[in-house]
């Protein structure tokens, strides 16, 4: 579904007071809408709500081999980011690179094994999961919970180290200010209810301390 069709379909379902699940690509050019109870094309979980039945887990030795990009390729992008920051073109940027994964798990198995609060599986296309709420609307109140900064929870004094890190603080100040400004475009009386609180996240390698805010 294209952009204009998506907006029209969302508005129509909203007008009829019909809940729906939607998936949009990062360029916002293509989208898909589903009923919350559809399971043939999409599985989803949002906090404690979901549309799938959890299967009985089978003991299986998991094969998981990652192949990150080379240091040279990573540094090439990093240097470009630094150039634009020093040039004043941006002051906050999420720099990521793709990592190839070789595994004996199916997308469905990856979906079920993930302990993330939020996850979605679009059949024959992708699986995605995140610990983070982007935006939440409840009873006319819109909230966002930006996460910036992680640290290995097993490190000595990890909590104190991440909260006292000047780089992490500067990054968090920036994203909170950006999200607050964005919410002010669509809402009134925007406030920061919680600034820099810690959450413990479990990953397949180790536990992490994650710094969040509530706006």
Each predicted region: which residue ranges?
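Extended alpha-helical targeting/anchoring segments
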Residues: 1-215
